[in-house]
Amino acid sequence: MLSTLSIQEKTVLYMNGVTKSFDGFKAINNLNLVIKPGELRAIIGPNGAGKTTMMDIITGKTRPDQGDVYFRNEVDLTRHSEAEIANMGIGRKFQKPTVIETLSVFDNLELALAGKRRVWDSLFFALPDSGRARIDEVFDIVGLGDRRHILAGALAHGEKQRLEIGMLLAQSPELLLIDEPAAGMTDEETAQLAELLKDIAGERSVVVEHDMEFVRALDATGTVLHEGSVLAEGTLDKVQANERVIEVYLGR
């Protein structure tokens, strides 16, 4: 049941007392997290801290053993399937791009825009003017307008990452979960991506899982996880000065 605090404050994501064990190992241990509308939040933590399991729980891939997970204050995500949660407005991008490389950049966005329609319908029926206008908007946001007619497989790694973010944006999500988007990027691509994520936050909430240096580029609130719980939260300078974070994350 939602707490008084969460009812009084509008939230996009509310997690309270969430726990998940696998064969006796607590991957998530009494996790509490609140994401507000339009917030850009960075999730930080070493391997095994619980970041992936947390995102799996939010998207319905994994069910928690206990705790509350609510979307928009009122939707109990633990009662819905992955597909239902995606259709509600929660999008997830994994670390490795999953664009269809044999289709053009435009066609990838068209397929994403189709949403509930079948791929066959998307490929063989004309896109309405409203759909084309939405795709043009997404091209403006992700900066790939001049690449729309080339095959997605010909894009650079950073461009593929931006295309996949665009594919999520085409579906107009309220909450985006993004897994290590800058992995394998050049410094220039990383800077461009940080600006993109800052731009798209505001109209929607964005949760980015990444390392501390990329979080600095985002200028976002950071939440540090350790052993499935929140270890520290605040600005990057604040969490980096936290003695427990220094001990656990930086290994000093």
Language-model segments: residues:
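Glycine-rich phosphate-binding loops of nucleotide-dependent enzymes
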Residues: 2-252
